[in-house]
Amino acid sequence: MVIDAGSSGTRLTLYAPGSDLTASRIFRAPLTTPGLSSFVDNPGDAGPQSVTPLLDALRDQLVTTGISPSDVPIALLATAGVRLLKQTDPAAVRAIFASTQAAITASGMPLRTNAILPDVREAALAWVDANALSGTLDDTAPRVGIIEVGGASAQVAFHSPRPRGPGVVQVRVDGRVLHTVAVSYLGLGSNETRSAMQTRLNGGKPCFPNNATGVNPKFYLAASQRRVASDRADFRGSPCGRTYAAVISDVATTVKEPRIRPQRLGSLPGFSRANFIGLGGVTFAYTDFAIPTTADPRRAL
């Protein structure tokens, strides 16, 4: 069982291992609880408020299916929101994980993992998942590349024809060693990027559409993020796009080798052959703007 402690929320999914590379999803909790990084001021509440409600929903499902809780090991994996928090308040992160561990232990289910998922591993695992589901892990098939936009970070990964090189990592799958370029950019997730754009634009009106009625919604963003009144927003593509590019540039200056700056991705071996798909926030953007999902994100990169 996996607890995905993402920056925008915490979710629980129960899987059953399959005979192939995929796993069957048995159950997904019908609720999303607050992200762990939101408990920076009250870390002791992370377990009771973020993890316990999910475990309660799981326990009800286990009773229905006749599965013993002792047979369901729990892996809690936190991602970029907690990575960011660790940079500024490592003590809070330790307290948050102590709280989540206590909640899992109290559930009677065995604890397998309660930690931050390394950023490059997050990118590589997303790549493996996409190719396993697409049936493209075989050497004879063109492999899928992924562009994943989460709440606090963005990941890019694609097959590398070379065993070594910038950003190349080894991934062991079903007894085979695969090579992939896997990179993660902390700060380029949708929430963090939007916050940075708000700061640069002194309020961000050019990045939101005008809603003259002033209802549904009345405001964009929470008050803590310099919210914008929807009837005063004034979307303008050029200044908004320039601001987004500036935020990407800011993040790029913090990337150190062997990490890859975003501007270099297109020159790496394997990039031009990958069939990219968008995950996370990319999918939401396609839906919101009615963009055909066949659009190739490689062109945007």
List the predicted regions and their residue ranges.
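Short, solvent-exposed loop/turn elements at domain surfaces
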Residues: 10, 22, 39-41
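Primarily extracytoplasmic ectodomains and periplasmic/lumenal surface modules that are beta-strand-rich
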Residues: 8-9, 19-21, 83
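A short acidic Gly-Thr/Ser loop motif
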Residues: 3-11, 147-153
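Broad, structure-driven detector of short, well-ordered beta-strand segments within folded domains
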Residues: 1-3, 17
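Beta-strand initiation motifs
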Residues: 19-27, 165
